[in-house]
Amino acid sequence: MSDLFTTIETPVIKYEQPLGLFINNEFVKGVEGKTFQVINPSNEKVITSVHEATEKDVDVAVAAARAAFEGPWRQVTPSERGILINKLADLMERDIDTLAAIESLDNGKAFTMAKVDLANSIGCLRYYAGWADKIHGQTIDTNPETLTYTRHEPVGVCGQIIPWNFPLLMWSWKIGPAVAAGNTVVLKTAEQTPLSALYAAKLIKEAGFPAGVINVISGFGRTAGAAISSHMDIDKVAFTGSTLVGRTILQAAAKSNLKKVTLELGGKSPNIVFDDADIDNAISWANFGIFFNHGQCCCAGSRILVQEGIYDKFVARFKERAQKNKVGNPFEQDTFQGPQVSQLQFDRIMEYINHGKKAGATVATGGDRHGNEGYFIQPTVFTDVTSDMKIAQEEIFGPVVTIQKFKDEAEAIKIGNSTDYGLAAAVHTKNVNTAIRVSNALKAGTVWINNYNMISYQAPFGGFKQSGLGRELGSYALENYTQIKTVHYRLGDALFA
């Protein structure tokens, strides 16, 4: 094998892993010859090393994307774009076990959950394949002697920076609408989880995309990510990640060429349970809402607010439910929670847990690492929490949840809106009027009623306040990747007097 590919064996499958930067439909080494290690979070061992993109590599990838956008990609019809995206989805479906195994390997998510992610990733691509030939403008009746119409044109070269918590799902969320709308892409993977996106990159060429349309590079935010954000020949940047980094990207975009920006950022989402809620249903969804994907979800229901009438009963039963979540080897069939993605993330979460203990909150269950190897953390439930505590205000991004008591609807809304974030929220109640009133009052981009974490690629997703700018998914995402041109065609012969 060359240093651009290696053979990796997982408990599920043995496969050939690309290691290079995918630029112009080829895997290549980085200009500076740098590589970095990819760690298995389940055992803390090195899986392999991949080539690292630096600023120079971003320049090469952007040049390839620009050449494709100005050249062959312009000649591909919208219907043909849709066919290509569908072909890519077909290839991902063919290799779904391989892709899911890769995500379990370098991300640590349960293999069964990874397959669900892949199904949604494939579905998302097919959804946008269907949109490719349905993007259109309108005619506007301004006066009898003028034909006025609008065109929705592609933005151009799009820089896309995806996170490590849902590598291929975010890959599809980004490239689906961008490519459907006729743009070209330079996508940077997270340095913790580059492997599945690199494998999927080889499917891009197999699907028949022209060279340069989709370029996939691996690298670090401080170098490759910064270069994308400030690049003068990138027309739009999309980022999913922390609010802190989102601010940096927005500043870089403004200081460079004022490129369009979409940001899907952090959250501290309230999951509100009223006295009249179906408590079994609420506990089930609240458990899924926080501990799914090891708590590494931007929209995780990390603050459970319970009305005082059922608070004690809820806490006791929720604690029991959390203790039933199996933490362990992501390749075992019944594993629900795998390891956190990295040592850095593990340490950060443990720091928050220790801070909560010192602040006076009570650990109802968990509060420590799980096992002696890997970045595993016990599902952790804090009670006796006040809204001013750090663990109730800041995004922890791990399997840690706070439970607070509220008296009435007004207090629930007040506590629910008491952070800087506004990505998501949930309301559990049997009263339709309560559900509608509270969902309307919550400052959140998505509100679930009597469920949690049910995101659909057909519906928009994004945040209020410091949880982001713009919307992913649904037809709304296409607005991020098109720009509107108005054309006034003079039909009459009269000269301007």
UniProtKB/Swiss-Prot annotation:
InterPro entries in the record: Ald_DH/histidinol_DH (IPR016161), Ald_DH_C (IPR016163), Ald_DH_CS_CYS (IPR016160), Ald_DH_CS_GLU (IPR029510), Ald_DH_N (IPR016162), Aldehyde_DH_dom (IPR015590)
Gene Ontology cellular component? extracellular region
Annotated site (Transition state stabilizer): N165
Binding-site residues, NAD(+): G241, S242, T243, L244, V245, G246
GO process annotations (BP): acetaldehyde catabolic process; acetate biosynthetic process; carbon catabolite activation of transcription; cellular response to osmotic stress; ethanol catabolic process; ethanol metabolic process; threonine catabolic process
Catalytic activity line of the entry: an aldehyde + NAD(+) + H2O = a carboxylate + NADH + 2 H(+)
Q: Where is the active site?
A: E264 (proton acceptor), C298 (nucleophile)
UniProt-listed Enzyme Commission number(s): 1.2.1.3
Key words of the record: NAD, Oxidoreductase
Q: Which GO terms describe its molecular function?
A: aldehyde dehydrogenase (NAD+) activity; aldehyde dehydrogenase [NAD(P)+] activity
Q: In which pathway does it act?
A: Alcohol metabolism; ethanol degradation; acetate from ethanol: step 2/2
Please give the family membership noted in the entry: Belongs to the aldehyde dehydrogenase family.
Name of the protein in question: Aldehyde dehydrogenase
Per UniProt, what is the name of the gene that codes for the protein in this document? aldA
